[in-house]
UniProtKB/Swiss-Prot annotation:
Gene this chain is encoded by: ANO8
Biased segments, Low complexity type: 933-953, 997-1006
Gene Ontology cellular-component terms listed: endoplasmic reticulum lumen; plasma membrane
Organism: Homo sapiens
Chain positions found as Omega-N-methylarginine: 1020
Protein's name according to its UniProt entry: Anoctamin-8
Topological domain spans for side Extracellular: 2-244, 303-356, 422-437, 772-807, 863-1232
KW Repeat (keyword) present: no
Transmembrane feature ranges: 245-265, 282-302, 357-377, 401-421, 438-458, 751-771, 808-828, 842-862
Asymmetric dimethylarginine PTM positions: 1020
Amino acid sequence: MAEAASGAGGTSLEGERGKRPPPEGEPAAPASGVLDKLFGKRLLQAGRYLVSHKAWMKTVPTENCDVLMTFPDTTDDHTLLWLLNHIRVGIPELIVQVRHHRHTRAYAFFVTATYESLLRGADELGLRKAVKAEFGGGTRGFSCEEDFIYENVESELRFFTSQERQSIIRFWLQNLRAKQGEALHNVRFLEDQPIIPELAARGIIQQVFPVHEQRILNRLMKSWVQAVCENQPLDDICDYFGVKIAMYFAWLGFYTSAMVYPAVFGSVLYTFTEADQTSRDVSCVVFALFNVIWSTLFLEEWKRRGAELAYKWGTLDSPGEAVEEPRPQFRGVRRISPITRAEEFYYPPWKRLLFQLLVSLPLCLACLVCVFLLMLGCFQLQELVLSVKGLPRLARFLPKVMLALLVSVSAEGYKKLAIWLNDMENYRLESAYEKHLIIKVVLFQFVNSYLSLFYIGFYLKDMERLKEMLATLLITRQFLQNVREVLQPHLYRRLGRGELGLRAVWELARALLGLLSLRRPAPRRLEPQADEGGGGGSGGGGRRCLSGGCGAPEEEEEAALVERRRAGEGGEEGDGPPGGKEEDEDDEEEEDEEEEEDEEEGEEGGLLDCGLRLKKVSFAERGAGRRRPGPSPEALLEEGSPTMVEKGLEPGVFTLAEEDDEAEGAPGSPEREPPAILFRRAGGEGRDQGPDGGPDPEPGSNSDSTRRQRRQNRSSWIDPPEEEHSPQLTQAELESCMKKYEDTFQDYQEMFVQFGYVVLFSSAFPLAALCALVNNLIEIRSDAFKLCTGLQRPFGQRVESIGQWQKVMEAMGVLAIVVNCYLIGQCGQLQRLFPWLSPEAAIVSVVVLEHFALLLKYLIHVAIPDIPGWVAEEMAKLEYQRREAFKRHERQAQHRYQQQQRRRREEEERQRHAEHHARREHDSGGREEARAEGSGLDPATSSEKASAKAKGSTAGGHGPERPKRPGSLLAPNNVMKLKQIIPLQGKFLSSGATSSLAAAGAGATTRPPPAQSPTGSDTRLPAFLSFKFLKSPETRRDSERSHSPPKAFHAGKLFPFGGTRAEPGSNGAGGQARPDGTPSSGSSRVQRSGPVDEALAEELEAPRPEEEGSGTALAPVGAPALRTRRSRSPAPPPPMPLPRPPTPPAGCWQWDGPWGCGGEGAAPRQALAAAECPPCAMAGPPPAPQPLPGDASFYSLPPPPLPPTSDPLETPAPSPSPSPSPQAVCWPSGWH
């Protein structure tokens, strides 16, 4: 199961125990109360700027944590264990620690991963990384198979930035999906529905955010926030906050730089053209045309700049997701998707349309009417102020300032209304949701910000009044926005929301005055509250951390007091530390001041600890119940893993438990209730006696002995290493109290309104661009400061550009042409410059000027490409490389497919050949039986011969499944292979000199020498080679010599010539046949083996064309006409079976052996007598060839004379003749 442990990154007070979460029905302390208790009530609601900045410098960094997941304080153990188990099973790459934040009373999962797991996650995410120069440079998606080509892949610290690590972990968490039918309490998941977003939308998970990395953050503070006159470190911003935020600051910096031109030009015109009306009219027309050209150039140049940055950051050609995940907030009815055939939520479009028509549209119109009425009210108030005589000049701007304040306040209300309407319209995809939200907010902001200006310019037609209103709105709104952006993250109430009310301002002023006062009041005495179960025990619940580092103004005076209080903890209940009278006097002075705040907050003294209360995690040990000694703090940390695991325990079964408060209240008080889950060791020891298995410490006991007893009784617990007494807050708990950074939506919205002020009505007020320039210089640093100090760190997002805001600002540029041309024509500038123009001519001139400006804008848009040339070339290179890689991949895939097809065809061919071989064996066995029956032989003997033949054909092989030689060996395409053997017959027959053998019952006869095989282990050639292809050296023609192989040719590779019986004294070893007819196998007999020779030997057992096709037997010259051999039919039985001679007839090839009918190892057959084969038994040379009668065919060569032998049973020695003639072969039809 999951590894869970209390973390080592946080610190806790020794000897102190945090409070348990309140029981049901008791209100939980707000999460925002942590900082109130850290810094005392004097800074209550004073502002998050001072608070968080001071606490930030004194927090303990959280190590080995990339993403923090927090839960509400009411979360039960079952929910935590269920989610923890799903994370560990579904995402085994993650390392999760479980902790409990003491002050916020929130559970938290500290999530991180190892470097190897992050590499696999980068491959899954498709994260683009820089490639080494020797491999082509540039960037490409990460691949684990080619990890060696990426830069810094060897370094764990330099390869991944913290933002990339967090993005990979977020990708894993968002892809943790539920199975069919899974449910958690009342939350029922669909199949493959993301679990984490759904639980966050339901409020079960409070927040999921990445943790700041203080080392990099401090460097950013120096190079970005504090370096006002330097360029922004955009690459560092991208590496830390992601592409989306870096793209916003790049756009803001580019916009601010471009604002220099209209600011300078407008300031010059405003300075030198205020002398007379004509100069002002000329400057108005010229500046309007200048703004049209400038806005167009700015937008087009930003496209090019944005393309360069997107290419540099690897997002220019990032492919969009093919299937976008539904929003977690999307609701509907369950149905089966017609596309994926899976269960999904469905919301009918007609319901959304009905809501838009009946709710959204009326509310939007009502808001516009409210804006119009507020504007009219402010104008009436201004008319009233102007009608009063004797008021100062500044009083004239009070109604305008009030209108600007109302516009700013209304903008926030309209934004919340737009978000509510968008949520109620229930959009399924995030892109559709964001698109409609932008439309609503832009519509509200446009009407709310520009309605008064349009009213003055188009209806009142008063340029002077328009200039004053524009200056008031622009300056006031920019000032309020900067103040709100900087202070709102630091001004908060219990719920953590930023409010800028009068009470917050008053509290901030009081806090600042208190800090600046010369006399700093001493701290009041802390007494244990009676409602906590009381007693002046040494429990940590009734004490307050005052040892410094908390940020309270009186911490220096309290530090010494705490040390004295520690020494006197076990004293009498009524005794107090020295200095008590002084504290009582100070308390009387501050009693009236703080009484109201005490009633408001309802604080409990036990929650004022500054130490971090860690959730304890224990493992139930399986097996023997022997007590294990407590591990050392160093042994609790596994090497390479930030998760703490107890040595010797099995991390398979674990539970969570609340830790008892140490000496907190009486045993019967509500705060002294036993924990919900008690942990017992395997030996049966419980923890119901005290917080750590021991007795509760008495009030008078020493704290050192208590801590020692805790260490001794903590063998089954996983506690963090004991550290020095530190009241500092952990970084993770502090960041969980910060306000969440919503998005760049609010920042773009402010810049959109400012851009409209500059380009729409700048002809009336040329200094608007200068005011915007000054504001933007402050805006960059204030936004940077807000991100680095006052807000949670956002997850990095990869975007290609600024998105829809580019189109919105382009539409604003087109609208600016129309508005400025109308102002020039209707406000009198054109009539004063050209008094001779009639009203109709003036209108035509304005229309012509408008069309000319639109044409100029279009030409600039077309003339300037959106992507620079060098970026386009690099993109073309990447596209070419991508296509080549795709082609290479296709070729490899096709090659693999062809190999698979070839292997499959070979397997099918092998199976067919094996089936054919088995069928042929079956048919040959049937023919043998039929022949045996026709010849009068015993069928059992024939079956034995058939089985012996099968054994001989498979001898030395791997089984009977090997195919035999195909019958097409002598086909025309194989003639060339066979002809290569013909010129080598002299070599084959040179060592094959033989002596004659006497036939059985006959005298001494001379036998021709057998043929010598090319392998040297056989003295005979195959029968089908002896007649048709082999020729004597005298009859060879020169044309046949050209077919001789240039190198030594081993016929044994093509035909197996080994394994036959040779006569003694010949080159091949052999043995004589025994008198009983069985062949003798001598020790010198050569057994040929090997896959090639054996396979070819089996192939030679197949019928040959001469056997099956012609049906004609061959005979030597001078023999009588042979009987015609009929194919595939048994020969007629002979009149009388003759006894088989012990030795083969001279010159007869048909004997048991590799070239005989039975094969090597076959059962001996009864051979015919010498009279049955007269040509073979004749001694001496045969007569000249003569034609045979009938249709019998023959081929013979004159055999050489053989020396006579005295012993007919003696095997003749090989003849030394260098080139004897081949032997004649006799095939009796009855033998085959």
